[in-house]
């Protein structure tokens, strides 16, 4: 019996009912085609970021192949072997132990390279969500992806990459929505607190994060609650780490440095001839020759520095004496200390990167054509076995101060440098493959402009402009806080790395805000004329002063054409002003 035509499919078969599964042979190719089309469309829309991401991936693969199993630094030994009590917390040691359970040091650097790529993607996406155009968001992420100093750090067994990643994670969480949600605030606080267990300089980051939680809240109730939640979640990992430290070592602290950590900085700045000090503290004053030769880092750590050679009078605390010395220098000569710190902070904007007298050599953060060695700490044998020197805490009188042993075979054992690749990476890094100082300066100026825009009342009346300015403020304040705070103990090019993932995004957001404002003004002039634009601006200021959003009816000079022109900015710089919405990515 023939079925009615209405009950059959195009080939005479029964049509698929609501409960019937689609044919695998026909559905799978269609799904693959649609997935491929979506991927192709995504790549076309984000072609610049895709190209930068691929370039960053290639550079990281080359670094991974060129230096095996990984690059080691002096401080690496305290994380691998507990070689000496560190001046930084040991949170990074937990990361190392987790990865070394399943791989060697090469696996550690592979993960660190992936973290570097993830930071670039995170910066790009969050800038898009806050209204930056694609090309500008991609350029803001480029330094993280392509900077040679960042690549070298990722290839080194050091905590810097994880410190940066935790900062980026916190910023992304806070900026994911125009008004940060309680869960995002709590997670961001935890990320920043964890950053302190990796590098103690992260302590300062609670300030810009709490300020943003207050300013972006939208109401006093949400502001107070957000700031309190941020501080509590920030404190949780820090107190947990200090409790573990107390249980293990008997010291409820983050690190052993304490109040003596800025001795090198203040001793470099001190004019001891005019200082009023007790006679027993005079020995802590370095000579001009010691300042020139040792610098702040050497004054803190060198075996021939006044701090290392100092012996406190009987019955007096050496730590207390050093603390009093630093306090007296700061009290009596604050401008000298501030001047030295400011001068070092400004070195980030220099056209070229050089090692000044007393600096930690910048070559330590540059790719070398051979496996790097450090006297008494790291060297390679004739058969390329990595030899590490572990400093003895209590050496026997007249005995050796170091004990030497090969790097554990489970960690990688032998050094293997592919010299052509190493030479390429070194040439890339030294010949333009880094973020130049003038670019940092431009980003700083634009970030400052975007941050100061928040003092204008009309910024708060336009959702898009408010979101751009607030995001710019968070990136800029984070950059300023961490860079200046890191330079207080001493200057090192290593400590400038957080600028890579904070200053360019701040500058990009500041520029996006300027472009948005300029585009709005041009469209209003084109539609309604210059006189209408002036009246429109005045109406917007009045609306902002009254606490309401600017609307087309707020000024009689606005026309339907002007409103349409302003709405069209979503194609370029603008995002949406609704709290839960974001521009299409």
Task: Please tell me what each predicted stretch does.
Residues 130-131, 170-185, 213-217:
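Membrane-interface transmembrane helices that cradle and orient dolichyl/undecaprenyl
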Residues 141, 185-199, 233-237, 241:
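Membrane-interface alpha helices of multi-pass inner-membrane proteins
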Residues 74, 108-115, 142-174, 182, ...:
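Multi-pass, polyprenyl lipid-linked donor-dependent membrane glycosyltransferases
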Residues 66-79, 84-95, 99-106:
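Extracytoplasmic catalytic/substrate-binding loops of multi-pass membrane glycan-assembly enzymes
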Residues 45-71, 145-146, 233-244:
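Transmembrane signal-anchor helices characteristic of membrane glycosylation enzymes that use polyprenol
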Residues 90, 94, 102-121, 153:
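Loop-to-helix entry region of an early transmembrane alpha helix in multi-pass inner-membrane enzymes
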Residues 255-410:
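Membrane-proximal stem/loop segments at transmembrane-domain junctions that anchor or position
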Residues 44-47, 103-114, 337-475:
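Membrane-interface anchor segments at the N-terminal boundary of transmembrane helices
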């Amino acid at each position: 019996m023939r079925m009615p035509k209405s009950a059959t499919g195009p080939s005479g078969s029964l049509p698929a009912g609501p409960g019937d599964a689609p044919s695998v042979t026909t559905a799978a190719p269609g799904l693959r085609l649609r997935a491929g089309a979506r991927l192709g469309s995504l790549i076309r829309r984000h072609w610049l970021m895709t190209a930068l991401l691929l370039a960053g991936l290639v550079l990281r693969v080359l670094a991974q192949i060129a230096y095996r199993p990984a690059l080691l630094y002096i401080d690496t030994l305290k994380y691998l072997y507990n070689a000496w009590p560190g001046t930084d917390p040991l949170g990074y040691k937990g990361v190392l132990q987790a990865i070394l359970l399943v791989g060697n040091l090469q696996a550690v650097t592979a993960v660190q390279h992936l973290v570097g790529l993830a930071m670039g993607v995170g910066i790009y996406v969050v800038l898009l969500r806050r209204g930056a155009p694609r090309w500008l968001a991609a350029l803001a992420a480029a330094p993280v992806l392509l900077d040679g100093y960042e690549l070298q750090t990722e290839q080194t067994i050091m905590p810097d990459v994880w410190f940066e990643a935790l900062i980026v994670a916190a910023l992304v969480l806070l900026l994911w929505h125009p008004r940060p949600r309680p869960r995002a605030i709590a997670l961001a606080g935890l990320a920043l607190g964890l950053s302190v267990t990796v590098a103690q300089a992260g302590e300062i980051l609670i300030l810009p994060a709490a300020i943003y939680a207050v300013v972006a809240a939208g109401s006093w109730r949400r502001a107070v609650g957000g700031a309190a939640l941020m501080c509590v979640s920030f404190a949780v990992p820090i107190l947990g780490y200090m409790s573990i430290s107390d249980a293990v070592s008997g010291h409820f602290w983050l690190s052993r440095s304490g109040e003596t950590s800025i001795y090198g900085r203040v001793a470099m700045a001190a004019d001891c001839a005019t200082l009023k000090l007790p006679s027993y503290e005079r020995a802590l004053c370095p000579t001009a020759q010691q300042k020139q030769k040792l610098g702040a880092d050497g004054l803190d750590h060198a075996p021939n520095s006044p701090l290392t050679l100092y012996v406190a009078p009987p019955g007096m605390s050496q730590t207390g004496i050093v603390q009093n010395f630093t306090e007296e220098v700061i009290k009596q000569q604050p401008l000298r200390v501030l001047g030295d710190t400011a001068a070092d902070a400004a070195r980030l904007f220099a056209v070229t990167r050089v090692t000044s007298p007393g600096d930690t050599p910048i070559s330590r953060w540059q790719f070398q054509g051979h496996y790097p060695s450090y006297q008494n700490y790291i060297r390679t044998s004739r058969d390329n076995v990595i030899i590490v020197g572990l400093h003895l805490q209590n050496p026997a009188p007249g005995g050796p101060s170091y004990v030497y042993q090969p790097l554990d075979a489970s960690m990688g054992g032998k050094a293997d440098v592919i010299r052509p690749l190493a030479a390429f990476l070194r040439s890339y890094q030294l010949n333009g493959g880094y973020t130049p100082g003038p670019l940092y300066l431009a980003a700083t100026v634009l970030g400052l402009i975007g941050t100061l825009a928040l003092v204008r009342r009309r910024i708060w009346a336009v959702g898009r402009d408010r979101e751009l300015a607030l995001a710019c403020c968070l990136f800029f304040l984070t950059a300023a806080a961490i860079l200046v705070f890191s330079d207080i103990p001493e200057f090192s090019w290593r400590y400038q790395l957080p600028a890579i993932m904070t200053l360019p995004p701040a500058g990009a957001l500041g520029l996006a805000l300027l472009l948005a404002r300029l585009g709005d003004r041009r469209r209003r002039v084109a539609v309604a004329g210059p006189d209408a634009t002036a009246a429109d601006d005045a109406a917007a200021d009045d609306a902002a002063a009254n606490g309401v959003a600017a609307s087309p009816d707020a000024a009689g000079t606005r026309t339907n054409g002007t409103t349409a022109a302003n709405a069209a900015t979503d194609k370029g710089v603008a995002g949406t002003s609704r709290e839960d919405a974001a521009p299409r990515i």
